[in-house]
C-alpha cells in the first residue's frame, strides 16, 4: 500500500510500510523488513508522481517486506543543496538508497563527499535517470562519475527506443526480453569505468550509436553494489511492466537478495 504524501513547504520525509514475505538480506531472518530510502527532487522531471511510482513498482514485484522512507525536495532548482545530506549519518540504518534526483549545478567537494561516503563505506545504491547528470561541476565531479560507473555528457531528443539486453545471463536480466519504451530520453555515455558491467543498451535516433542504459557498478574499496539505469524520464516509461520488473530486479540485486527467488510470480 502506498500512502498518499501530503503537501509540505520544502522537504517531505515520510515512512511507508508495506508488506510481502521474504527476508531483507541473506543474513536476516525470514520475514524481516528491509529499510529503503528514496531521495528525489530537483530539475526537469515529474518527481511528485515518480516518488510514488518507484516504491509501488518494487512493492508490486518483490516478495520483500520493505519500509520506505521518501525524501522529496520540492524544487526545480538544480543547484539546491539538501541539508539532509550534510548530516554524516544520513544513510545510517538503510539497507539500500534509491537516488532519483536532478541537481546538476552543484560542485561543492564537501557536499558531494557527504553523499558518496556512506556508499563508499558499503551502503548499496540504485541510481535512476538524471542522477547520472547530478553534481557534474566543480573539481571533484569525476568522483560522482566513478560512483555512477559512467560519465554522461547529455542526452538526445525524446523518442521511443528498443532496450536491447547485452548480458542475458546476469542475475538482473536473466529471463527478460528486449522491450521498446513508449517514450524516452537516451543518455549519451562517453566514458565507462572499468568497475561497471553493461546489462542493456539502446540506439540513438540522433547519432545512430548504441549507448549503455542499464548497468551495475562495483564502487569503491568495498565494491559496493550500485545498480543504475538512465531510462526513466517519462512516467509512462516507468509504468511499463518491463521497466517495473527491471527496476525491482536491480533493487533486489543491489540489496544482496537472490533476484529470481525474491520476485513475485508473473501474472498470467
Predicted feature residues:
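Helical hinge/lid and interdomain linker segments adjacent to catalytic or ligand-binding clefts
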Residues: 28, 35-39, 46-133
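A glycine-rich, often tryptophan-bearing local segment used as a flexible ligand/cofactor-contacting loop or short
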Residues: 104-175
Amino acid at each position: 500500500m502506498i500512502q498518499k504524501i501530503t503537501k509540505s513547504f520544502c522537504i517531505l520525509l515520510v515512512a511507508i510500510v508495506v508488506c510481502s514475505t521474504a527476508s531483507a538480506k541473506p543474513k536476516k531472518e525470514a520475514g524481516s523488513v528491509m529499510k529503503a530510502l528514496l531521495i528525489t527532487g530537483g530539475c526537469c522531471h515529474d518527481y511528485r508522481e515518480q516518488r510514488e511510482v518507484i516504491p509501488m513498482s518494487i512493492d508490486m514485484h518483490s516478495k520483500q517486506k520493505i519500509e520506505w522512507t521518501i525524501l522529496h525536495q520540492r524544487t526545480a532548482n538544480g543547484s539546491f543543496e539538501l541539508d539532509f545530506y550534510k548530516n554524516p549519518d544520513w544513510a545510517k540504518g538503510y539497507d539500500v538508497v534509491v537516488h532519483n534526483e536532478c541537481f546538476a549545478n552543484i560542485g561543492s567537494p564537501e557536499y558531494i563527499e557527504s553523499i558518496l561516503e556512506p556508499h563508499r563505506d558499503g551502503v548499496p545504491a540504485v541510481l535512476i535517470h538524471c542522477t547520472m547528470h547530478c553534481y557534474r561541476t566543480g573539481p571533484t565531479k569525476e568522483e560522482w562519475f566513478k560512483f555512477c560507473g559512467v560519465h554522461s555528457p547529455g542526452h538526445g531528443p525524446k523518442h521511443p527506443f528498443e532496450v536491447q539486453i547485452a548480458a542475458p545471463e546476469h542475475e538482473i536480466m536473466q529471463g527478460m526480453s528486449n522491450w521498446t519504451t513508449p517514450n524516452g530520453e537516451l543518455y549519451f555515455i562517453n566514458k565507462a569505468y572499468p568497475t561497471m558491467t553493461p546489462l542493456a543498451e539502446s540506439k540513438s535516433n540522433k547519432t545512430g550509436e548504441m549507448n549503455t542504459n542499464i548497468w551495475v557498478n562495483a564502487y569503491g574499496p568495498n565494491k559496493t553494489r550500485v545498480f543504475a539505469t538512465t531510462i526513466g524520464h517519462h512516467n509512462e516509461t516507468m509504468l511499463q511492466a518491463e521497466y517495473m520488473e527491471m527496476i525491482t530486479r536491480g533493487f533486489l540485486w543491489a540489496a544482496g537478495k537472490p533476484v529470481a527467488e525474491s520476485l513475485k510470480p508473473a501474472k498470467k
